[in-house]
């Protein structure tokens, strides 16, 4: 059942072509902080910064670095980095494309990219500047700790001294996710009731009889983690309960899911599949996807059953499975996990049952869908939004937060409560107290800053760039970043939670601290020497699949609308043993 794996070059090409649908934002914006370009003939030392056109630039988000650059420029206005020059001039641009193929001749000095930043590969070709001094400043001067997985990604090629030095710095991260409307869940009683609840609401639906909480007396179940008194209480603990919840929401006139619409928007659907996959699998064995293996066997799919279907949907056969211990010999089976198939199957079930909001069926932008989800529609309220965890600040900045203003006006001033959703950890039944699994987050959007090695040729410019990076990674500027955008950089800095000003990011901080977070980083050379083959963000290998020998670039949801099945996508996106052997050979070089 192994299909042709989507190779590195194709992954990169698709990542680039999908950038426009990623966050629907134009590239090439240029913002100088001074009065000139900082070129050789200018009166100031110039620093050119290029950001990936993404969540850190969208809807005015780029202001975080514009403001930081302005503060640094003011601080250094009287400092001379180069003979005959005084002060610095920082030019900030953003673009969909980071020019990896032409770094040696590119005019930018500092870059920020999501997911694809590959310090090992580009330090090996001597195109990146070593950043050990900045890392030392963060850890020794600022007394901060960088996340261990982030540090793995920051390491470059083995140098002449036999050491791997740092060539990148961690920036914001985001995970695959669903966001649920806490207000809606509370008002409509969409939480599962605890088994011995005195008051509850019984629902006899398509997937059996189930008890939900009484909104007036919410006695919630223990949720997917199997522990009472935690953030996931009352949320579906199994995919069976998730189906029961969606069926109940639809029976009450609501829409379980909303997602940016149309063929383009459905590329967001991988967020749902990968989030469910990680939650079902759990961190211990899910780490195999970055070649960090466990001795615990993994359940993998070997075929499909006749006459047995996924929650009765005759378009979705149940799989035949076996247990396998993954290692460098069997690592090609990492994408064969039964949990990945079940996640794909659940999205097909959602499509087959029309569990998507009507706006999903038209070519509706992310901004419009987010507005609908936040402000709500009395005629068709959406319970859950499918997107990465980056989405919230984009919505807050869009149209000056008009959706939140509308909510406040129509709700009588109630707090808008939206939250990252902990997802099911088992296939069927209900998780009993003490039997659940910790929430697993799949951080696929790790971004990094890195520096063009050309900067090293000019001692004055190198000092200016180094000082600017130290400034950005000071405690004060790290705090300013999060207090403005709400997003987190994987360093243990403090910030004023009150400045976040909303339920989503304050609750997310707690949820993240309680979760197992899996980042695309590893000590295994098969991973870090083949990074592009392990990327699971936008444009990653599993976003696409082969069907009848053709690479299909539509998103999962659009594929289901076009008649494809979970089985089609699953079998068309596994990793062949032959390709895996090539990756192993690359790791030995």
Feature roles, as predicted:
Residues 340-355, 365-403, 416, 442-450, ...:
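Glycine-rich, aromatic-lined ligand/substrate-binding cores of catalytic
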Residues 246, 284-367, 411-414, 423:
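Glycine-centered hinge/linker elements that transmit conformational signals in sensory
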Residues 2-10:
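Bacterial N-terminal signal peptides that target proteins for export
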Residues 97-111, 184-185, 229, 243-249, ...:
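Short helices/loops that flank or line small-molecule/ion binding pockets
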Residues 11, 22-127, 133-150, 191-192, ...:
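Conserved N-terminal structural module of periplasmic/extracytoplasmic solute-binding proteins
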């Amino acid at each position: 059942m192994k299909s042709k794996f989507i190779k590195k070059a194709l992954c990169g090409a698709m990542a680039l072509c999908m950038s426009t649908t990623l966050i629907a934002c134009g590239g090439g914006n240029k913002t100088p902080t001074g009065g000139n370009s900082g070129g050789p003939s200018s009166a100031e030392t110039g620093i050119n910064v290029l950001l990936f056109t993404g969540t850190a630039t969208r809807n005015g988000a780029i202001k975080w670095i514009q403001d930081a650059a302005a503060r640094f420029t003011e601080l250094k206005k009287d400092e001379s980095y180069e003979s005959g020059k005084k002060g610095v001039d920082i030019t900030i641009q953003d673009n969909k494309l980071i020019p990896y193929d032409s770094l040696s001749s590119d005019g930018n000095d500092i870059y920020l990219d999501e997911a694809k930043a590959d310090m090992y590969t580009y330090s090996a070709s001597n195109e990146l500047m070593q950043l050990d001094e900045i890392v030392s400043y963060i850890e020794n001067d600022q007394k901060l700790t960088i996340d261990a997985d982030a540090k793995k990604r920051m390491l470059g090629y083995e140098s002449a001294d036999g050491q791997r030095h740092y060539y990148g710095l961690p920036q914001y991260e985001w995970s695959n996710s669903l966001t649920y409307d806490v207000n809606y869940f509370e008002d409509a009683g969409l939480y599962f009731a605890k088994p011995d609840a005195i008051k509850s609401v019984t629902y006899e639906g398509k997937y059996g009889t189930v008890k939900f909480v009484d909104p007036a007396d919410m006695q919630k179940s223990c949720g997917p983690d199997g522990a009472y008194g935690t953030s996931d209480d009352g949320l579906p603990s199994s995919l069976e309960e998730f189906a029961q919840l969606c069926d109940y929401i639809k029976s009450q006139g609501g829409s379980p899911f909303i997602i940016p619409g149309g063929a383009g928007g459905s590329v967001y659907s991988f967020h749902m599949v990968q989030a469910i996959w990680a939650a079902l699998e759990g961190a211990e064995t899910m780490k195999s996807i970055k070649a960090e293996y466990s001795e615990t066997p993994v359940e993998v799919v070997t075929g499909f059953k006749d006459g047995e279907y996924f929650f009765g949907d005759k378009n979705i056969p149940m799989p035949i499975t076996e247990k396998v211990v993954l290692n460098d010999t069997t690592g090609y089976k990492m994408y064969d996990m039964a949990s990945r198939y079940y996640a794909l199957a659940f999205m097909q079930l959602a499509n087959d049952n029309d569990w998507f909001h009507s706006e999903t069926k038209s070519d509706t932008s992310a901004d419009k869908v987010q507005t609908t989800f936040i402000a709500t529609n009395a005629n068709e309220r959406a319970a859950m939004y499918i997107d990465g965890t980056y989405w919230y600040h984009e919505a807050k900045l869009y149209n000056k937060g008009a959706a939140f203003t509308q909510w406040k006006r129509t709700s009588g001033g109630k707090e808008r409560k939206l939250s990252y959703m902990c997802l099911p950890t088992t296939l069927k039944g209900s998780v009993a107290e003490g039997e659940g699994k910790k929430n697993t987050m799949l951080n696929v959007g790790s971004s990094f800053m890195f520096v063009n090695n050309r900067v090293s040729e000019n001692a004055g410019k190198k000092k200016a760039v180094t000082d600017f990076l130290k400034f950005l990674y000071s405690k004060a500027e790290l705090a300013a970043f999060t207090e403005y955008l709400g997003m987190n950089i994987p360093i243990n800095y403090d910030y004023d939670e009150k400045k976040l000003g909303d339920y989503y990011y304050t609750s997310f901080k707690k949820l993240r601290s309680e979760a197992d977070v899996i980042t695309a980083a590893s000590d295994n050379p098969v991973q870090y020497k083949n990074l592009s083959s392990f990327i699971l963000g936008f444009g990653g290998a599993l976003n696409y699949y082969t069907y009848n020998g053709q690479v299909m670039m539509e998103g999962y949801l659009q594929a289901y609308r076009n008649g494809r099945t979970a089985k089609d996508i699953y079998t068309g996106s596994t990793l062949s043993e032959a390709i895996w052997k090539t990756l192993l050979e690359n790791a030995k070089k």
